[in-house]
């Protein structure tokens, strides 16, 4: 990249950050409730950085229009979130993550950033430390599924069982698991405003990567219970996990 091109890119980044700062100061959209999308604050500079680091395909992305308050992708387009890409998600999705979405009937935005961090770490644990493909039984041994319902606006309101549109599904480490605890932020502020558009990239032997986008809320999650056969099947993997932690190789992934 020439010096002139670098200067132009830096100027675009600076202009984009100023515009994003203005958008963050806008009032919440009418009718907004906890867990809904927020108007996007993503800038061209944000996405150029992802391209530069190999996290986003060149010319595959599109910024939302200034007047968009929630995503509405074009044909073949999908909705990605910076918060999720920064925690390990990319297109095409890892086959294990695609299986997770199918199991829960979920979309990318149904999972909060910390759930993506847990999934990324688990995949790395299996592939790089234990030496096996991500194993569904081991995942169920380690994690339980959790849900996040819409918060009441006041104490007098009836309790709702509706799950949040963004971040309604998550994972929590089971107390008895030897899986090392990850140091994660308790919450990622305004991550629902980090969305942008990207062309879908299909998984191997599949017609799509991410499912088509919708504004449907997630369904209450199925519990991650192990059958007796699964418990026997994963015993060698559990022993391998304990060994990884004992050797100190499992606390920084």
Region locations from a protein language model:
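Residue-register detector that marks a fixed positional context within folded domains
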Residues: 1-253
């Amino acid at each position: 990249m020439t010096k002139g091109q670098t200067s132009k890119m830096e100027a675009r980044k600076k202009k984009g950050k100023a515009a994003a700062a203005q958008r963050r100061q806008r009032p919440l959209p009418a009718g907004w409730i906890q867990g809904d999308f927020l108007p996007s604050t993503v800038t061209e500079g944000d996405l150029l950085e992802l391209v530069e680091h190999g996290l986003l395909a060149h010319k595959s992305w599109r910024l939302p229009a200034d007047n968009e308050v929630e995503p509405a992708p074009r044909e073949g387009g999908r909705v990605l979130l910076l918060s999720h890409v920064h925690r390990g998600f990319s297109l095409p999705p890892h086959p294990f993550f695609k299986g997770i979405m199918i199991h829960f009937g979920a979309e990318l935005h149904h999972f909060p950033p910390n759930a993506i961090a847990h999934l990324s770490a688990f995949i790395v644990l299996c592939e790089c430390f234990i030496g096996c493909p991500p194993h569904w039984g081991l995942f169920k041994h380690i994690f339980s599924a959790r849900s996040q319902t819409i918060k009441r606006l006041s104490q007098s309101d009836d309790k709702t069982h509706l799950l949040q549109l963004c971040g309604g599904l998550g994972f929590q480490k089971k107390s008895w698991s030897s899986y090392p605890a990850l140091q994660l932020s308790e919450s990622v502020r305004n991550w629902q405003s980090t969305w942008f558009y990207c062309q879908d990239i299909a998984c191997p032997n599949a017609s799509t990567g991410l499912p088509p986008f919708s504004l449907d809320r997630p369904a209450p999650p199925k519990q991650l219970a192990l059958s007796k056969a699964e418990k026997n099947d994963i015993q060698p993997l559990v022993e391998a996990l304990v060994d990884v932690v004992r050797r100190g190789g499992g606390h920084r992934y």
